[in-house]
């Protein structure tokens, strides 16, 4: 690893006439200008290639209990400049090594009236800006409560935005594409039902927010290293096109309880004239602390199947019985009730999944609905809902563990909390120890429904601290965590790579809840995945959900070839083949791609991209010279031209191409696909047609 600092300058200012500082990126393409206004209000501007992309925007924080907030009346008392350049190795990721190169400007500001000091630290990379607030230890600012963070992001015009409604509890919305000026009138139609939701403004949107200016500049706003702070949303003034940060409140309406010394999360702006650069940016990861886990040998990417989709579609149930309307854990005797015959997490059925996983080379099997409590788990705001260790009578924990071990298959635990965070924390050590005792080294946790204690939100400070506690506690037991319904990620997986996955967006399950837009996965890599990988659970081959459950008329709004492409487009070290084994058995030739595609990558190339319309990505296997290409296409059929110049010169490869058939269409003919093979080199160019809602996948094997 390279790791060096240069040009370290500290200057004390009397600051008369010296209230503006500038910072350039290492390659000189970006320039940030900081200034204090006449009343001492901090501001910043951002330029790319001499073009303003963020207009002068105010910085500051409003305090809840103090007469004077940290908004103005500042003077500059210290300036420190650094340059930092390193290349760090990933435990897992889209590449094995990431370059972290930035110029830094740390400005100490002192408030005249209160003599309080804050530091605003800027880091300017070759692809964008990160900045945060820092609160040094001082007698005039120790314990304080945030009423609101007043960070602004002033846009230069009425950009096109790809947004979801600002919500304290969920990100599980379809994206809306509109001008900024149109958000207000479209907001109510963009809000769809969810198990728990709370909007705050009809111009409020969530990050990661993706935009495109009229002159073709792509801009992404997000945050990094969200720890012990509230999740940031953005509230738009649609008269001025200025976004202001909007933090998630707690049950009392406060936005954060802080104790100096402390820091805010980083606010990030990624920008480029090429959409592919947004996908390639590693600013979010680079702004997080290095890995804190000394031995990471137990953290391993996983390809898995699971007893899950059949419950999501309504074909099977999580609950063991229909005879118990009210479960009292430790009192209700499930051995004395009649099973409902739809309970999927039974020993015989789970062993069938284990057999399928072993036959086709998967690593693990997830089982949901194995533990007592599912009869009244949802909508009751029940605290003691699960104990995470007591199985239903038809689920033999030891027998399943022994059987899976004999087949070389790992089991993935499921901990649904029903939002009862205190109950989960009370049982966490016992639950994690139960996992270790029974051979589970990964857990999928869930937070469906309103958060308990009541009044808190999924994205408020104390609940974010709960998620972090579960991640760090899991390290003690060498357990990998895949958190669903938790806050969207902000790069913390660099620091704690046992956080191997999150959902935290509208995943595949919504295809069985009425469907998602056909261009959904052309937007997720530009938005949700900017913060970290997503357990999207692709691989659905049967698009007509009524064939699984006659009472569910949902339709999966993609083609089968698109589902294959998602294993490359939707990066995750945790990849599920989500459909039922019997559906894969009908399409074993297409299923071969899912079997072949790795979950560990050496490098990634972004071949073509336009948010909302198409994405094509090539990735090289970490453990071989093989490459894999995936495409996801939006509503309009198109032709992709694939340049194979990413392949090594002088070598020959065989490409197996899984593409939409000529008559494929996500609505009318989603299972129409074709498979072909051809020899390719780094000089090859290939044109592939994609259907509406379609895509393609290519496996490229070196010919030796």
Where are these regions (language model features)?
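C-terminal beta-strand-rich structural cap/linker in extracellular carbohydrate-active enzymes
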Residues: 677-704
């Amino acid at each position: 690893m390279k790791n060096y600092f240069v040009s370290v300058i500290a200057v004390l200012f009397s600051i008369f006439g010296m209230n503006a500082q500038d910072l350039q990126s290492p390659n000189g393409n970006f320039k940030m200008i900081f200034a204090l206004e006449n009343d001492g209000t901090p501001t910043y501007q951002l330029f790319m290639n001499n073009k303003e992309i963020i207009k002068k925007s105010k910085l500051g924080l409003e305090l809840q209990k103090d007469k004077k907030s940290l908004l103005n009346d500042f003077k500059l008392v210290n300036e420190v400049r650094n340059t930092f350049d390193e290349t760090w190795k990933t435990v897992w990721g889209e590449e094995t090594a990431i370059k972290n190169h930035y110029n830094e400007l740390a400005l100490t500001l002192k408030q005249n009236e209160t003599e309080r000091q804050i530091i605003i630290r800027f880091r300017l990379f070759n692809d964008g800006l990160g900045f945060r607030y820092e609160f040094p230890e001082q007698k005039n600012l120790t314990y304080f409560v945030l009423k609101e963070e007043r960070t602004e992001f002033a846009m230069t015009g009425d950009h096109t935005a790809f947004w979801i409604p600002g919500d304290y509890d969920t990100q599980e919305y379809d994206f809306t594409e509109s001008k900024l000026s149109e958000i207000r009138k479209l907001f109510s139609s963009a809000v769809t039902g969810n198990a728990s939701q709370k909007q705050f403004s009809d111009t409020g949107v969530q990050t990661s927010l993706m935009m495109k200016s009229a002159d073709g500049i792509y801009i992404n706003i997000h945050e990094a290293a969200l720890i012990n702070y509230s999740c940031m949303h953005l509230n738009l003034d649609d008269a001025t096109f200025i976004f202001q940060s909007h933090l998630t409140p707690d049950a009392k309406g406060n936005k954060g309880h802080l104790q100096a010394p402390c820091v805010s999360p980083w606010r990030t702006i990624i920008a480029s004239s090429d959409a592919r650069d947004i996908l390639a940016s590693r600013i979010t990861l680079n702004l997080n602390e290095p890995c804190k886990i000394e031995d990471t040998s137990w953290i391993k990417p996983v390809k898995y199947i699971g007893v899950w989709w059949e419950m999501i579609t309504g074909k099977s149930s999580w609950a063991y019985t229909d005879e118990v309307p009210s479960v009292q854990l430790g009192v209700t005797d499930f051995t004395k009730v009649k099973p409902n015959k739809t309970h999927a997490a039974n020993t015989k059925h789970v062993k069938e999944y284990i057999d399928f996983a072993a036959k086709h080379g998967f690593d693990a099997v997830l089982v949901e609905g194995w533990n007592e409590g599912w009869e009244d788990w949802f909508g009751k705001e029940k605290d003691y809902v699960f104990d995470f260790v007591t199985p239903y009578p038809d689920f033999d924990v030891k027998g399943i563990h022994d059987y899976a071990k004999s087949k070389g298959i790992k089991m993935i635990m499921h901990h649904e909390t029903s939002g009862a965070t205190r109950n989960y924390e009370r049982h966490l050590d016992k639950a994690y120890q139960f996992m270790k005792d029974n051979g589970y080294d990964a857990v999928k946790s869930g937070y469906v429904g309103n958060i308990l204690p009541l009044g808190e939100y999924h994205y408020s400070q104390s609940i974010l601290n709960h998620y972090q506690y579960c991640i760090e506690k899991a390290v003690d037991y060498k357990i990998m965590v895949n958190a669903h319904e938790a806050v969207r990620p902000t790069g913390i997986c660099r620091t704690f790579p046992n956080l191997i996955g999150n959902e935290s967006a509208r995943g595949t399950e919504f295809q069985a809840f009425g469907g998602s837009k056909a261009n959904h996965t052309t937007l997720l890599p530009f938005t949700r995945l900017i913060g970290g990988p997503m357990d999207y659970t692709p691989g659905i081959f049967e698009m007509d959900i009524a064939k699984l459950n006659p009472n569910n008329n949902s339709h999966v709004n993609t083609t089968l070839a698109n589902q294959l492409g998602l294993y490359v487009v939707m990066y995750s070290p945790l990849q599920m083949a989500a459909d039922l084994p019997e559906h894969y058995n009908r399409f074993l030739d297409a299923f071969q791609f899912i079997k072949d595609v790795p979950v560990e990558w050496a490098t990634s190339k972004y071949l073509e991209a336009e948010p909302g319309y198409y994405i094509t990505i090539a990735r090289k296997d970490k453990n071989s010279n093989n490459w894999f290409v995936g495409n996801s296409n939006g509503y309009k059929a198109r032709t992709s031209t694939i340049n194979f110049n990413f392949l090594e010169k002088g070598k020959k490869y065989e490409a197996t191409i899984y593409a939409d058939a000529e008559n494929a269409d996500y609505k009318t003919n989603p299972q129409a696909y074709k498979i072909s093979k051809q020899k390719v080199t780094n000089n090859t160019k290939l044109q592939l047609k994609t259907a509406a809602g379609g895509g393609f996948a290519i496996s490229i094997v070196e010919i030796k």
